[in-house]
Amino acid sequence: DLASLLFSSVIIIPEDFSEGEIPFWVRPVEIGDVLCFKVRQNLLDPKRLALKRAMDLFLSVVGGIAIFPVLVLIALAIKLESRGPVFFRQNRIGRGGQTLHILKFRTMVCNAEEVLQKYLRENPDLREEWEADQKLRNDPRITKVGAWLRKTSLDELPQLWNVVWGEMSLVGPRPIVDDEIVKYGSAFASYTRVRPGMTGLWQVSGRNDLSYKQRVHLDRFYIC
């Protein structure tokens, strides 16, 4: 793990090998008569990083201008349904472990924490579901407009501003909160090497149907 954080290409010589143990992000190579595994860390390549950043900046600026009327309509819908601000800021962990303030359309009621705690007290069987993935299939905090925004992922659109400022990327591991560091385990070091993304592999591979372990696995695969 340490070598993968320092070098863009790492060759591993296993002590033991049995068929079926090769992770799909490594490539078998042969050095002499020895079977080795080559791990390519593409996101440590400065050229790839520069190209990715250029694409992020171009697409986010052009896309933001194109969808501006949609953003205005969404803002009006939020204000008409419930009181409170249109946008919601949340602290997440960004590149290098720095605090990242992500911007989203508000999809919950203003007293969301109070509503959540009351709901969990009245439905103790759902506490385990919440503690496992920090998600509920039928979340009582979410407004009607918010439910639609989340289903279509339109609540993430304001994060284009985070992308323009270089705090996020269009594609990458989803930004996590402090409480999720333990769940990430050894993969957290890999997570902090890149900019979090507006979308990522696990969002297009199953969303809420995936376990947290599967989400981490897909994020790590993308980084490698």
Summary of predicted features, one role per range:
Residues 1-68:
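N-terminal hydrophobic signal-anchor/signal peptide
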Residues 129-195:
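A short, structured surface patch at a secondary-structure boundary
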Residues 6-16, 155-163, 204-207:
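Hydrophobic alpha-helical segments characteristic of transmembrane helices
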Residues 32-40, 58, 126-132, 139-146, ...:
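Bateman (tandem CBS) regulatory domains
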Residues 24-27, 87-140, 199-217:
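Short, glycine-rich, amphipathic interfacial segments at transmembrane boundaries or analogous
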Residues 63, 145-152, 220-224:
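Short, well-ordered beta-strand elements within core beta-sheets of diverse protein domains
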Residues 137, 165, 182-224:
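C-terminal terminal-structure detector
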Residues 47-115, 162:
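A hydrophobic, helix-centered structural microdomain
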